[in-house]
Amino acid sequence: MSIIKEFKEFAVKGNVMDLAVGVIIGGAFSKIVDSVVKDLIMPVIGVLTGGLDFSNKFVLLGTVPASFKGNPDSFKDLQAAGVAVFGYGSFITVLINFIILAFIIFLMVKFINKLRKPAEAAPAATPEDIVLLREIRDSLKQR
């Protein structure tokens, strides 16, 4: 069997196609979660913490060059200038993003597994010998 033929069989299998669709939908879904975190959750957390903006929280690890013309309090400006910064605020945002995404995926898997559960099987039919013995018992009771 040639390599091309083997690859073709592999590529058209249901699992590979399902995976491709899942990756595409996951990419689009992660943008939604990013927006929920950045635009909805982080502003609320900022209000609750007194206007704290996590996205711009960092620790300066290097020295700011004398030629730096940006805002020395801006994480993005310092990072763009190549200054070593430890951006823990960005990490907190990504962590919240991950927790939300993991929880939503957990709920989806739980729902799908609930749908996949087979219906309760009907009770097995009583074997003929048991039926016959019951008939004999009932017949003897009537005498």
From Swiss-Prot:
One of its GO terms (molecular function) is mechanosensitive monoatomic ion channel activity. The chain crosses the membrane at residues 10-30, 89-109. It holds the Pfam family MscL. Keywords: Cell inner membrane, Cell membrane, Ion channel, Ion transport, Membrane, Transmembrane, Transmembrane helix, Transport. GO terms for cellular component: plasma membrane. It is found in: Cell inner membrane. It comes from the Bacteria. It is a multi-pass membrane protein. Channel that opens in response to stretch forces in the membrane lipid bilayer. May participate in the regulation of osmotic pressure changes within the cell. Belongs to the MscL family. Homopentamer. This is Large-conductance mechanosensitive channel. It comes from Burkholderia multivorans (strain ATCC 17616 / 249). The gene is mscL.
